[in-house]
A protein has these predicted regions:
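Short beta-to-alpha linker loops that shape the active-site pocket of alpha/beta-hydrolase fold enzymes
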Residues: 138-142
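A generic beta-sheet turn/junction motif
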Residues: 82-84, 95, 106
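Glycine- and small hydrophobic-enriched segments that form the cores of compact globular domains
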Residues: 109-110, 133
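Short amphipathic alpha-helix adjacent to the substrate-entry channel of hydrolases
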Residues: 117-136
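Short strand-loop-helix active-site module centered on a catalytic nucleophile
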Residues: 89, 104, 126, 147-180
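A glycine/proline-hinged amphipathic helix-loop "lid/cap" segment
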Residues: 1-91
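Conserved catalytic-core motifs of eukaryotic protein kinase domains, centered on the activation segment
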Residues: 115-117, 145-147
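Short beta-strand element of the alpha/beta-hydrolase
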Residues: 99-108
Length: 180
């Protein structure tokens, strides 16, 4: 099997960053991204790789995408109770203010992979550019839980935050759910 190749259903996909680019406009940053993604391609082969290997590789691959970015006035990790366990959340406050609108951020990954760390930069940028508090919900993933538990956890976090909004210094009337 070639390095950087994997199977998706009946298709074999090969990522080879040494291939000639289709256009000479590919810059050095994008070339580095293609090289890095090729390094992790084997971990995403669902025919041979394990779920744990895939999640670990995804976390490593995403580190490059999450460095730098805006500084937050406050970053707090919370554990929100739900049905006998807790759901981790991260509150990002971009500026010191008495009350700010809230964006509830539910990361992408198809309910299979990802967390607040793999989507940290986009959360910080969202907070900084919108002026809103961003609450990243680190819902549990398949196969740890079955669908629709992740969505139920997100709803539970929103309800819980609604009951303690004064403690968090957020504006109760302006909320935006966002799944990215």
């Amino acid at each position: 099997k070639e390095k950087g190749s994997y199977t998706m259903g009946e298709f074999r996909v090969t990522i080879n960053p040494k291939n000639k680019p289709a256009t000479p406009e590919v810059n050095w940053q994008q070339a580095r991204v293609l090289e890095m993604q090729a390094e992790y391609a084997d971990a995403f082969d669902t025919q041979t790789g394990s779920y744990d290997e895939m999640c670990a590789a995804y976390g490593e691959e995403r580190k490059m995408w999450n460095s730098g970015g805006p500084e937050m006035e406050e970053t707090i990790e919370y554990q929100i109770p739900y049905e006998g366990y807790t759901v981790p959340v991260r509150l990002l406050r971009p500026v010191k203010a008495e009350k700010l609108p809230v964006i509830f951020f539910m990361h992408g990954g198809g309910f299979v992979e990802g967390d607040n760390d793999t989507h940290g930069l986009v959360q910080r940028k969202l907070a900084a550019y919108s002026g809103c508090v961003v609450i990243g919900i680190d819902y549990f993933l398949v196969p740890e839980v079955r669908y629709p538990v992740a969505i139920e956890e997100c709803v539970a976090v929103c309800k819980y935050v609604n009951t303690i909004n004064l403690h968090l210094h957020i504006e109760k009337t302006i909320w935006f759910p966002l799944m990215y």
